[in-house]
Amino acid sequence: MNLNEKNTKYVVHLSSFPPRECGIATFTEDITNALDQKFNPSVKSRIVALNDNPTSIYNYNAKKVAGEINANEISYYVNLAKELNLNPNVKVVNIQHEFGLFGGNWGDYIIPFLQVLEKPSVITFHSVLENPDDELKNVVSTIASRASALVVMNSLSKEILTLDYQIRPEIISIIPHGIPQVAL
């Protein structure tokens, strides 16, 4: 994984990424471009792309995508966390969370990653489901318990996380989903 540029701090984003066709991929591209415009060169965004199966081959932008993992193989998550822990240039890990992106039941393959990860982590929940069954509640609560901070897109999502999942409201920030500017 190429995260060794001298005197560079990295925010590593664990997400799908273009050219994979996925709304979260587009969102991650937009947010990393905005962060890089604002903070580069002192902090740079890099992606670890989630591939949906072992035969997925995407022609990723090598300047942005530092690595990729098979989202349906739990060992990749653990190995990635260990690798990130060893890299002093990685300052924070941002996880773009959508249940369908991560392997396992309700995307629970992300949990071993978070259990091994020693870096601060920010998790953006793109979907927050109300009235969870016990399994879903356990997965989301465990993910939240390992995060340094959570981000949701609206106040209803924050309310659901607080009431239905008993997640502390002080770790949840609301950042409304924006729309990138398009030249006409």
Question: Model segments located where?
Answer:
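N-terminal subdomain of nucleotide-sugar transferases
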Residues: 1-67, 88, 149
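Short N-terminal targeting/anchoring amphipathic segment
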Residues: 68-69, 82-107, 120-124
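Short acidic capping loops at alpha-helix termini that bridge into adjacent secondary structure
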Residues: 169-172
